[in-house]
A protein has these predicted regions:
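Lumenal/extracellular "mature" regions of secretory-pathway glycan-modifying transferases
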Residues: 2-256, 261, 276-427
């Protein structure tokens, strides 16, 4: 029996497909062992991990919601709208680690910074485009613009954010952004109280005497900073009807609004929403002030802050009520997961960290807690611990480099395909 020889064009096509497949596989699986080994869910990595596994309830004892979570598929398309001084840097690290493990594509700013056009509304020109590749995650500072986000992100994207008690958030922002120094009242005994003696006069004096180009970005957060991040225009800060409508809009458009004061509870809600594992949400706190920089506020000052940032207060009160409604409907498994998360976090701190350190934050003189990784860890554990301490800027640099390589690989493959198409009849 004589076998017919395949046409030369078909042979070339088959070889080409094999080459392209090999390149793609090489790109996505070619990380070093160090890059691939930072999952931290094994028993030996976490003190008490074996007991946690052995003490799990039997399948027959688990609630229906946990069974549904077990069957669901992990969601990988997420917009995390960062708000200022709400614990969002910690959550960003969680998303960054998950995205790296799962080889997801991130929205990366065009400039070498950690902001996507903020304080301006997010626009497509604020991000690096990777041809026809849709990003999976956005978790850099940006100002909420749903119309543009809908064009940029996949249709099934999950939208989440986090807010905080507006009094604590304002006090933290005032300190972190060094508003006392910017506004020329740092020489006062208490710059925060000095500001609230007459905030409008302080701001008018600043406008008349200072170069507005220098610190104007920061001062966008001097009033209703969280709602500003979430898209409310400053002209509407005193319009209660517009505030109410915008709160309802955010309620419709966001799948979850977390609360900093209930951080672990929020993370378990996030885990269940995204169908992730507890190991995906372990964390070290990022961007925290030293305790010595924190202060207690008088009742009078609390009232003034609430009146000054009344839009933020309305925002927080609304979503706090919704949060507690969700909390009241949780099963015992939900609260067990909180306990497991805290145990894992404590174990990782003990295993990974020698001690916390202090370093200056993004804004000059404010001291922020940092991390010192223990020595004599295994290489895999050292990498795992180290990635948990990476701040947003470091991760963005990593993604910017990694995704540039992805773009170059894609363009090389397209060039190869176009070249072959000039002499291989594919039809």
């Amino acid at each position: 029996m004589i076998r017919k020889r395949l046409p030369k064009s078909v042979t070339v096509l088959v070889v080409t497909i094999c080459i392209i497949s090999a390149i793609i596989v090489k790109f996505y699986s070619g990380e070093s062992a160090k890059e691939k080994s930072f999952t931290i869910s094994t028993e030996q990595d976490i003190p008490g991990g074996k007991n946690l596994i052995e003490n799990k309830p039997r399948e027959s004892q688990k609630g229906q919601k946990q069974e549904e979570t077990k069957r669901c598929k992990p969601k990988k398309n997420v917009v995390f709208l960062k708000t200022h001084k709400t614990g969002s840097s910690t959550i960003t690290n969680i998303f960054n680690r998950f995205g790296e493990r799962n080889k997801l594509v991130f929205v990366v700013p065009t400039e070498k910074q950690n902001r996507l056009g903020w304080p301006w509304f997010f626009q497509e020109e604020h991000m690096i485009h990777y041809d026809k590749i849709k990003p999976n995650m956005l978790c850099s500072h940006s100002r909420y613009n749903r119309e543009v986000l809908d064009r940029v992100m996949p249709e099934d994207t999950v939208y989440v954010t986090i807010i905080r008690d507006p009094v604590a958030q304002f006090e933290s922002t005032f300190s972190y952004m060094t508003f006392g120094e910017i506004l020329g009242i740092s020489n006062k005994t208490d710059p925060l109280e000095a500001f609230f003696e007459n905030p409008k006069d302080v701001l008018v004096n600043y406008i008349l005497t200072q170069d507005l180009r220098i610190n104007s970005d920061r001062l966008k957060l001097i009033r209703n900073g969280m709602f500003f991040d979430l898209g409310l225009e400053s002209k509407d800060f005193d319009n209660m009807e517009d505030i109410r409508q915008n709160i309802q809009r955010l309620d419709r458009e966001f799948h979850l609004v977390m609360l900093m004061e209930y951080f672990d509870e929020s993370l378990i809600m996030l885990k269940n929403l995204l169908c992730w594992d507890i190991e995906d949400i372990v964390y070290f706190h990022h961007n925290q002030r030293k305790e010595t920089h924190k202060r207690n506020l008088t009742n009078k000052l609390v009232t003034r802050i609430e009146q000054w940032s009344s839009a933020d207060k309305a925002l927080y009160d609304y979503f706090k009520t919704l949060f507690f409604q969700k909390l009241s409907n949780q099963t015992p498994d939900f609260f067990r997961d909180i306990s497991v998360l805290r145990t894992k976090n404590a174990g990782l701190r003990d295993r990974c960290l020698d001690f916390t350190t202090e370093h200056n934050g993004d804004y000059q003189d404010v001291e922020i807690q940092g991390f010192k990784i223990k020595k004599n860890l295994t290489k895999a554990m050292e990498t795992s611990c180290d990635k948990m301490t990476w701040n947003e800027v470091k991760y963005l640099g990593y993604f910017r480099y990694k995704q540039k390589k992805l773009l170059e690989t894609t363009e090389s493959l397209r060039t190869l395909w176009d070249y072959l198409a000039t002499f291989v009849p594919f039809t």
